């Protein structure tokens, strides 16, 4: 699942003159594997193709630099690695895009177009002030802890979790052989056990996971897990190493009760 060189070569072949833009997920939301975005972005720059990055799983735990990548856009939600409220997010723009539609604004209602001064020209209507304030605090937390520190912490927990799960009978863990290519997301499945039922059983034991196809059927098809799905565990800056053995103990207990 994680072969950076093959990924780059496959994209090089697919990057024909007809391609108007290239959109990449920095980290797989299913398997946690990190794409070689530096090389992919370089190919886009060489061919003049806009590079767009989905940093949903990487913002706050991996370096994401707009200028360094030469990206046209980088999108990220606020409620994941930035520790903000749901309903918030950021869109980083390499250049100001031309407006498709314009409307009136509360600050200059007599005009039929947005004003040309900041911040009004970017803001219309009533804003999610509480969400923005919460996102700001999340950003301050990430800045204080350090992106590299958070990322290292999450990778260490993921390695610990992957090694522990792999020792359980009947458990198949989907992970990179190179820990540096794995973020804080890990998927697994249990032979002969429905992943939805397993997720619910763990949930009853206060282990929060997500089971199924994770809104990514093509990723599951590639991995050969489309029929079964997987159980996905993820870690954050607030998880500690002592939680991993408890998770594994609860899973082992469930497996021992399996008919």
Kindly give the residue locations of the regions a language model identified:
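Pyridoxal 5′-phosphate
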Residues: 1-259
């Amino acid at each position: 699942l994680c072969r950076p060189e093959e990924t780059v070569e496959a994209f090089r072949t697919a990057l024909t003159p007809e391609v108007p833009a290239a959109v990449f997920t920095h980290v797989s939301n299913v398997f946690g594997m990190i794409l070689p975005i530096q090389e992919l972005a370089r190919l886009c720059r060489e061919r003049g193709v806009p590079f767009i990055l989905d940093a949903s799983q990487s913002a706050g735990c991996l370096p994401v630099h707009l200028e360094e990548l030469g990206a046209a856009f980088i999108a990220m939600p606020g409620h994941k690695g930035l520790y903000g409220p749901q309903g918030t997010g950021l869109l980083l723009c390499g250049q100001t895009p031309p407006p498709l539609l314009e409307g009136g604004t509360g600050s200059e209602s007599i005009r039929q177009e947005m004003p040309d001064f900041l911040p009004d020209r970017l803001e219309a209507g009533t804003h999610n002030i509480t969400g923005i304030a919460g996102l700001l605090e999340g950003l301050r937390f990430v800045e204080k802890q350090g992106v590299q520190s958070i990322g290292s912490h999450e990778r260490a927990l993921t390695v610990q979790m992957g090694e522990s799960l792999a020792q359980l009978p009947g458990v198949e863990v989907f992970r990179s052989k190179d820990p540096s290519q794995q973020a804080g997301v890990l998927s697994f499945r249990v032979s002969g056990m429905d992943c939805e039922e397993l997720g619910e059983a763990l949930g009853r034991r206060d282990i929060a996971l997500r089971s199924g196809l994770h809104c990514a059927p093509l990723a599951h098809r590639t991995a050969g897990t489309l029929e079964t799905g997987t159980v996905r565990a993820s870690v954050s800056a607030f998880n500690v190493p002592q939680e991993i053995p408890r998770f594994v103990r609860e899973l082992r207990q469930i497996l021992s009760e399996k008919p």
